[in-house]
Amino acid sequence: MTNEGRFKAKGFVRTSSTTRPIQALSFHMIGILLQCVLFISVLSIAVSEALCNSQDRESLLWFSGNVSSSVSPLNWNPSIDCCSWEGITCDDSPDSHITAISLPFRALYGKLPLSVLRLHHLSQLNLSHNRLSGHLPSGFLSALDQLKVLDLSYNSLDGELPVEQTFRNGSNRCFPIRIVDLSSNFLQGEILPSSIFMQGTFDLISFNVSKNSFTGSIPSFMCKSSPQLSKLDFSYNDFTGNIPQGLGRCLKLSVLQAGFNNISGEIPSDIYNLSELEQLFLPVNHLSGKINDDITHLTKLKSLELYSNHLGGEIPMDIGQLSRLQSLQLHINNITGTVPPSLANCTNLVKLNLRLNRLEGTLSELDFSRFQSLSILDLGNNSFSGDFPWRVHSCKSLSAMRFASNKLTGQISPHVLELESLSILSLSDNKLMNITGALGILQGCRNLSTLLIGKNFYNETFPSDKDLISSDGFPNLQIFASGGSGLRGEIPAWLIKLKSLAVIDLSHNQLVGSIPGWLGTFPHLFYIDLSENLLSGELPKDLFQLKALMSQKAYDATERNYLKLPVFVSPNNVTTHQQYNQLFSLPPGIYIRRNNLKGSIPIEVGQLKVLHVLELSHNYLSGIIPHELSKLTSLERLDLSNNHLSGRIPWSLTSLHYMSYFNVVNNSLDGPIPTGSQFDTFPQANFKGNPLLCGGILLTSCKASTKLPATTTNKADTEDEEELKFIFILGVATGFFVSYCFYWCFFARLDAFISK
């Protein structure tokens, strides 16, 4: 048998000589591959252990153990590399130190952990929009001497800025901090040169401490040490004194904000050297003097807001050199003169507000044709004269316009219909004519939501249905005010078509007739003022079916858009500064004082649970004060004075805990004045003219006046008294019956016992 046969007999197959080296090579390569895999695995473990610096890791774990969040807790897993934890960034060094912590909007609360100070390589720390509290620790920058960005805004930090004493390593090199944002906290005290972030900082580019309670003078020394500063924000604090000279050293400054403080004096001249300035925000202070002509040097200025100060003088004639201006707000000052013609060169203006100054001139002569981007125009409360400025129709982007409280004459131009985006129009307190023509034109403004035209059209007749033929006019009107004009006629029925109406003011006119019940059908109406008219008849029950006043849910369904201009619903409110920037800020109320209404107050009034104000004074209302008024749990003001109301003041009104004003002067009320709750705070004068009232805050005792004829008491109170009498009699009768039964049973058994 051959060798090949022997191999086959044993079950083997002979391989060729060429296959044996290949198999050996394959086994060798597999071995090498396994060694590589093992090496990579060991290397990855070693690298993994080396990625996270152990000291930094312990500091972070200490950090997470000292802050909490019920909304978004820190789920840092101690078993994995800390460089992979959420919000953590490490450098590429062999030790892999922590260089950044970014955990905004996590609802973290607790003290700012001191363990952060051990992260000596930290360059960025962002813990903004949380609930951290406590003081900033002393030595903050000395420990974190690599920190470049610090954002602790929107927290609850308090106390003063600590004084920085020494550097961590004893060297004299400066801190590299570049961005500091401590806004929206509760920090206080003065910002001194030795304060943290001030001593040894030479690279600051942004410093924001707005919305705190800092006091003293606005610091300017950082402009000397950090000339690269581009943003300074000191607004919404309690800084006092003058704006210091020295801010002009910040030649790179693009944003300077110090509004809403108590600073005074003039704007320093070196401010006008800031050629890079884009925003100058100094409103709501006590600044005086005039706006210097040198302000035209700030050619990069986009926003100039100096409103609510005591500035005088005229607007610089060359204001048009500020061609990049987008917002010019100089309202509520004492600025005089005319609007410079060069203002037309500010073609990028989006918002122009010069309200409440002493400006004059003819508005119709102003060139509005170049303001193609203008969205908000407010020239109210000045002394502008002439016809309605028809050229304003060139401002195609205009959405809000106010010329109220000026001396405008003539009629509203049909060109206003070209302002397709117009949503707010305030023309109150002028000398405009032809209300029928005005409303006929304005009903075509499809986007108009607020129309204030009161104190115009004196002694004209309110247009009737036949005068306004459009069936779909004012489709989006929410606020309509035409009070103070002495308008004649009746409340027009065409108003019922305004289904979006939420606020209506027809006060201070000469309207006659009755109050239509359909006023109660508006789904969103929550504010009605019909005061000081000649309206007669009774209060319609349907008026108290207003859905928006019957439930909080329906009231909340009313659109709550932010108004682009503050609204003075009644033109008389301008002097008392009762302005509203949001529709729902108006107190839900019904004002019908000083009319000729008679009859009783409908009990349906108790359905208006959202009502805050009810004024029915100076009418001829009679009957009782309905106890259903106690269901108005949101009521703050109730004025029923100067009517013919009788009976008692319902004791149930003491449950109205929000009621801060109550007046029933000059009625025919009797009985005791309720005590307790808010009734202990109302002055005695609010009850005068009711000789039969007693008790409470009055000196008159109720001993001689508690027994009053039933006709002078409230029906509800009488029913309560009758019910009490019935219960008393029933109780006495029951007692006699039980006693008799007991007596009979006892003596019956006694007789039986004796007989035995």
From Swiss-Prot:
**By its UniProt entry, which InterPro entries does this protein fall under?**
DNA_repair-toleration, Leu-rich_rpt, Leu-rich_rpt_typical-subtyp, LRR_dom_sf, LRR_N_plant-typ
Q: In which tissues is it expressed?
A: Expressed at very low levels in the shoot apex.
So which stretches are on the Cytoplasmic side? Answer: 747-756
Q: How does it sit in the membrane?
A: Single-pass type I membrane protein
Q: Which PANTHER family match?
A: DNA DAMAGE-REPAIR/TOLERATION PROTEIN DRT100, L DOMAIN-LIKE PROTEIN
Q: What happens when the gene is disrupted?
A: Normal resistance to F.oxysporum (f.) matthioli in cv. Columbia. The double mutant rfo1 rfo2 is strongly susceptible to F.oxysporum.
Please give the biological process terms from Gene Ontology that the record holds. Answer: defense response to fungus; innate immune response; meristem maintenance; response to fungus
Q: Where is this region: C-cap/acidic domain?
A: 699-725
Q: Could you tell me which species this protein originates from?
A: Arabidopsis thaliana (Mouse-ear cress)
UniProt function note: Involved in the perception of CLV3 and CLV3-like peptides, that act as extracellular signals regulating meristems maintenance. Contributes, with WAKL22/RFO1, to resistance to F.oxysporum (f.) matthioli in cv. Columbia relative to cv. Ty-0.
Gene that codes for this? RLP3
- Signal peptide location in the record? 1-50
Q: Where in the cell is it found?
A: Cell membrane
Q: What is this protein called?
A: Receptor-like protein 3
- Keyword Repeat tagged: yes
LRR repeat spans: 95-119, 120-143, 145-169, 174-199, 201-225, 226-250, 252-274, 275-298, 299-322, 323-346, 348-370, 371-395, 397-419, 420-443, 445-471, 474-498, 499-521, 522-546, 548-569, 570-593, 608-631, 632-656, 658-681
Q: Which GO terms describe its cellular component?
A: plasma membrane
Q: Which family does it belong to?
A: Belongs to the RLP family.
| Short name of one Pfam family | LRR_1
Superkingdom, taxonomy of origin: Eukaryota
Q: Where are the transmembrane segments?
A: 726-746
What are the entry keywords? Cell membrane, Glycoprotein, Leucine-rich repeat, Membrane, Plant defense, Receptor, Repeat, Signal, Transmembrane, Transmembrane helix
The annotated region (N-cap) lies at 51-88
Extracellular compartment spans:
51-725
Where do the record's glycosylation annotations fall on this chain?
Answer: 66, 126, 169, 208, 262, 273, 334, 345, 381, 434, 447, 459, 573, 666
